[in-house]
Amino acid sequence: MGKNITVLGAGAWGTAFGQVLADAGNTVTMWAKEQRIVEDIRDRHHNAVRLPSVEKLPDNMTATGDRAEAVKNADIVVVAIAAQFARVALVEFKGLIPDHAIVVSLMKGIERGTNKRMDEVVRESLDLPADRFAAISGPNLSKEIADRHPAATVVACTNLDNATKVAEACTTSYFKPFVTTDVIGLEMCGSLKNVTALAVGMARGAGYGENTAAMIETRGLAELTALGAAAGADPKTFFGLAGVGDLIATCGSPLSRNYTFGANLGKGLTVEEATKVSNGVAEGVPTTDAVVALGEQLDVPTPLAYQMSRVLNEGISCSEMLAGLFGHEVTGE
């Protein structure tokens, strides 16, 4: 039997995941602030602003701009809001979400200023117990999922039964979820790989080849694994779909906003110019400084994140960024 599921945020990924949930037989309500998007989804089953490639969304998807109406009957509430705005947006839903509902985060990022993961931000904002929070992460490029190309993901919750409930609610013929209790690992994977994707994209945009890209990806994986382990994550998580899988997809596709943003930087655009071309800032941009700060907090070296921070804040070139990665003593891998 299908569930009542609300998706907060009708961007490309939120809408694409809403379609997955609808295809799985659930009744889906999208919540958006923009009245134009609400009316488009509700009246025309289309999201021309954020996901124009899908001509018709399923009939069991609707939309509203009213917060209370959006969540009043929800069994599951999915959060697909830009990570850096999550806390401000979610506070408005405190006290509105039913006590039995599981809250699921699709967000990937570290909150700037607090260095907190999205699970911490969501739980603090909604005063939510750990067993009612779940996160979803994996190699999930929204355009491909919107086109119903086969894909897999990972659902993490400290309560395995609740992780399974969420996984069952988003299982379709083309979308396969796996479950884990390693929320910290999943959150760290989803957040930190965006910094690596920026760096790989920048190298590609500057004209560097496979060796350079492979070096950045591999060292980026080592960096995020070390950070995750220091934060209490299971290192195995970083070598599954949420880690290596997401890294491969994000670092190798022009569909990835982080990769594309980095590529534009590599071609010589400034951060401001790349933001305009990308129609917004990629999540990896505000996350980069937070990763550096988190590394300092956990006493874990973050050379790649540090060099990307210099790119974003000081405007150094790709060649200078790469030179910075080589300016260390010889160590074991």
From Swiss-Prot:
Main subcellular localisation: cytoplasm
Keyword Acetylation among UniProt keywords: no
Secretion signal, residue range per the UniProt entry: none
InterPro entries: 6-PGluconate_DH-like_C_sf, 6PGD_dom2, G3P_DH_NAD-dep, G3P_DH_NAD-dep_C, G3P_DH_NAD-dep_N, NAD(P)-bd_dom_sf
GO molecular function, a single term: NAD binding
EC number(s) given by UniProt: 1.1.1.94
Binding residues annotated for sn-glycerol 3-phosphate, in chain numbering: K108, G138, K193, D246, S256, R257, N258
Subcellular location(s) of the protein: Cytoplasm
PROSITE patterns: NAD_G3PDH (PS00957)
GO BP terms: carbohydrate metabolic process; glycerol-3-phosphate biosynthetic process; glycerol-3-phosphate catabolic process; glycerophospholipid metabolic process; phospholipid biosynthetic process
Domain of life: Bacteria
Keywords: Cytoplasm, Lipid biosynthesis, Lipid metabolism, NAD, NADP, Nucleotide-binding, Oxidoreductase, Phospholipid biosynthesis, Phospholipid metabolism
Binding site for NADPH: W13, K33, K108, S142, R257, V281, E283
Catalytic reaction list: sn-glycerol 3-phosphate + NAD(+) = dihydroxyacetone phosphate + NADH + H(+); sn-glycerol 3-phosphate + NADP(+) = dihydroxyacetone phosphate + NADPH + H(+)
EC class name: oxidoreductase
Active site (record annotation): K193
GO cellular component terms listed in the entry, alphabetical order: cytosol
Transmembrane segments: none
Pathway: Membrane lipid metabolism; glycerophospholipid metabolism
Family: Belongs to the NAD-dependent glycerol-3-phosphate dehydrogenase family.
PANTHER family documented for this protein: GLYCEROL-3-PHOSPHATE DEHYDROGENASE, GLYCEROL-3-PHOSPHATE DEHYDROGENASE [NAD(+)] 2, CHLOROPLASTIC
NCBIfam families assigned to the protein according to its UniProt record, in alphabetical order: PRK00094.1-2, PRK00094.1-4
Annotated protein name in UniProt: Glycerol-3-phosphate dehydrogenase [NAD(P)+]
Upper lineage: Bacteria, Bacillati, Actinomycetota, Actinomycetes, Bifidobacteriales
